[in-house]
């Protein structure tokens, strides 16, 4: 399935879904860290779609959900753009922004894939609802929306939900779950590889199992990669740092295996926050990880 002839780079400079502002500067930081040069060295044809126009803050009010209407507007526009990219047989590579933009990414993909597999690389499960979320930040609900968990206006964005199926989803790198999320993961049958599982099985076995799950009966596989899946010592520039994450080599190895599978049909990299970074270290790492997904090798 992967790779199509062209990679379409879509920047989404949007950070209202996160608890701390700054991730809206992530796409530019990733570009500044040498993304185009890296892709050029890989001789990959790249179409730069430019930044998606993001809504201005207009004091939307919702009793529990922060920036609810801005997030609906943003993801409605993002879904249309992602759908357009897929329709041209190009590979959508979405650069966030916070993880609430995943709602628009898979909403656009769902207009072309009826049984989408999803690899959710993240310290968190992002399966909260307006009732279970301790913060009201929608970046912690983005996967849940795809499964039909959440307010109708979010789940009814064209293609947004409920369009994903629990049996087609794999969480990797998880290490902080709220009580409601634990319960939902157990009851729904979503496969979750926590850091404990990675320690016990090794990343190679985890990825073998993960790829087996997301390619079984699916017609496409989307990678949603939150940079906070890595250990904060490797990736300090992100808003919700949880110690004890995926190592530098584990992350690269996982992405190299995804490239070798030739099954990934779209990807997004989110939650790079340059205002919290150390010398653009996290943005540079993100460029390297994207390169591993797209075929960069040591030899």
Which sequence ranges carry the predicted segments?
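Solvent-exposed alpha-helices and their adjacent loops that cap or buttress functional pockets
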Residues: 2-3, 111-113, 135-137, 158-164, ...
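Short, structured patches in soluble enzyme cores that scaffold and shape functional sites
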Residues: 120-123, 147, 168, 173-176, ...
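Active-site metal-binding loops of divalent metal-dependent hydrolases
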Residues: 14, 98-99, 123, 174-175, ...
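Catalytic cores of soluble, metal-dependent hydrolases
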Residues: 4-14, 20-93, 105, 111, ...
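Aromatic-lined glycan-binding groove of carbohydrate-active enzymes
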Residues: 166-168, 175-180, 217-221
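A general structural motif
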Residues: 150-154, 172-178, 205-206, 247-252
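Short active-site oxyanion
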Residues: 90-92, 166-170
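Active-site histidine-anchored catalytic micro-motif
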Residues: 91-156, 261-262
């Amino acid at each position: 399935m992967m790779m199509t002839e062209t990679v379409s780079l879509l920047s989404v400079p949007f950070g209202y879904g996160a608890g701390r502002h700054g991730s809206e500067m992530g796409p530019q930081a990733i570009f500044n860290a040498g993304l185009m040069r890296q892709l050029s060295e890989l001789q990959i044809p790249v179409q730069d779609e430019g930044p998606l126009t993001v809504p201005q803050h207009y004091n939307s009010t919702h009793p529990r959900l922060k920036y609810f209407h801005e997030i609906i507007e943003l993801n409605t526009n993002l879904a249309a753009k992602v759908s357009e990219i897929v329709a041209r047989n190009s590979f959508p590579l979405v650069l966030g922004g916070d993880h609430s933009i995943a709602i628009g990414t898979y909403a656009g993909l769902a207009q072309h894939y009826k049984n989408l597999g999803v690899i959710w690389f993240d310290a968190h499960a992002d399966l909260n609802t307006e009732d279970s979320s301790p913060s009201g930040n929608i970046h912690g609900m983005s996967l849940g929306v795809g499964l039909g968990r959440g307010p109708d206006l979010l789940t009814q964005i064209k293609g947004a939900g409920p369009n994903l199926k629990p049996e087609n989803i794999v969480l990797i790198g998880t290490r902080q779950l709220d009580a409601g999320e634990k319960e939902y993961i157990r009851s729904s049958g979503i496969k979750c590889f926590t850091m404990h599982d990675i320690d016990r099985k090794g990343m190679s076995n985890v990825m073998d199992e993960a790829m087996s799950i997301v390619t079984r009966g699916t017609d496409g596989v989307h990678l949603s990669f939150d940079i906070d899946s890595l250990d904060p010592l490797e990736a300090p520039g992100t808003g919700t740092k949880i110690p004890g994450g995926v190592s530098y080599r584990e992350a690269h190895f996982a992405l190299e295996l995804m490239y070798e599978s030739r099954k990934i049909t779209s990807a997004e990299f989110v939650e790079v926050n340059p205002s919290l970074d150390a010398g653009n270290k996290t943005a540079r790492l993100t460029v390297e990880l994207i390169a591993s997904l797209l075929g960069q090798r040591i030899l």
